[in-house]
Amino acid sequence: MCHSRNHLHTMTGLRAPSPAPSTGPELRRGSGPEIFTFDPLPERAVVSTARLNTSRGHRKRSRRVLYPRVVRRQLPTEEPNIAKRVLFLLFAIIFCQILMAEEGVSQPLAPEDATSAVTPEPISAPITAPPVLEPLNLTSESSDYALDLKAFLQQHPAAF
């Protein structure tokens, strides 16, 4: 517990008065004798000194409160989560496969899958592959559309 200087002076002022008269304001008493005698002090003076001590004890002292400097708190470092990284990698692989997939092309079966799917009967006729559609023209219509576009561009060269 911290004591102020004023509190220490009041404690030294409670000592018995010295035979030599003092002129200091903290040791001088207004109601007591200046010279030490064995005579008891009057009752009124004892009560007033008791009140004086209690009033000084309850007096508010100004305290200087020191707060720490305002420092930005650092958040604890987050541990890397392996499951999140693996999930992100899986999504990236699936996204790349979907992006690079060719539409309309059937994927051939692996040799292990082909042997298990084939019946034990020998195949006499060769297997014909389905007709491959052109990637640019996936419709069953003829290429009249391309000719119409060429004719339009010849008639209207400034259109595009």
UniProtKB/Swiss-Prot annotation:
List the Extracellular topological domains: 103-153
GO BP terms in the entry: DNA damage response; glycolytic process; intrinsic apoptotic signaling pathway in response to DNA damage; mitotic G2 DNA damage checkpoint signaling; negative regulation of glycolytic process; negative regulation of inflammatory response; negative regulation of mitochondrial outer membrane permeabilization involved in apoptotic signaling pathway; negative regulation of systemic arterial blood pressure
Where in the cell?
Membrane
User: Its membrane topology, per UniProt?
Assistant: Single-pass type II membrane protein
Name the domain of life this protein comes from. Answer: Eukaryota
Q: How is it modified after translation?
A: Glycosylated.
Coiled-coil ranges from the UniProt annotation? none
**GO cellular component terms, A-Z:** membrane; mitochondrion; nucleus
Q: Describe how expression is induced or repressed.
A: By serum growth factors and TPA.
Taken from the record's topology, the Cytoplasmic segments are 1-85
Q: Which residues are glycosylated?
A: N137
- What InterPro entries does UniProt report for this protein, alphabetically? IEX-1
Q: Please indicate if the UniProt record lists Metal-binding as a keyword.
A: no
Indicate where this protein is primarily found: membrane
Ordered alphabetically, the record's keywords are: Glycoprotein, Membrane, Phosphoprotein, Signal-anchor, Transmembrane, Transmembrane helix
What does UniProt note about where in the body, tissue by tissue, this protein is expressed? Expressed predominantly in the lung, testes and the uterus.
Any S-S bridges, and between which cysteines? none
User: Which intervals of the chain are annotated as region Disordered?
Assistant: 1-35
- Role summary: May play a role in the ERK signaling pathway by inhibiting the dephosphorylation of ERK by phosphatase PP2A-PPP2R5C holoenzyme. Also acts as an ERK downstream effector mediating survival. As a member of the NUPR1/RELB/IER3 survival pathway, may allow the development of pancreatic intraepithelial neoplasias.
Q: Which family does it belong to?
A: Belongs to the IER3 family.
Q: Kindly provide the name given to this protein in its UniProt entry.
A: Radiation-inducible immediate-early gene IEX-1
Q: Which organism is it from?
A: Mus musculus (Mouse)
Q: Which gene encodes it?
A: Ier3
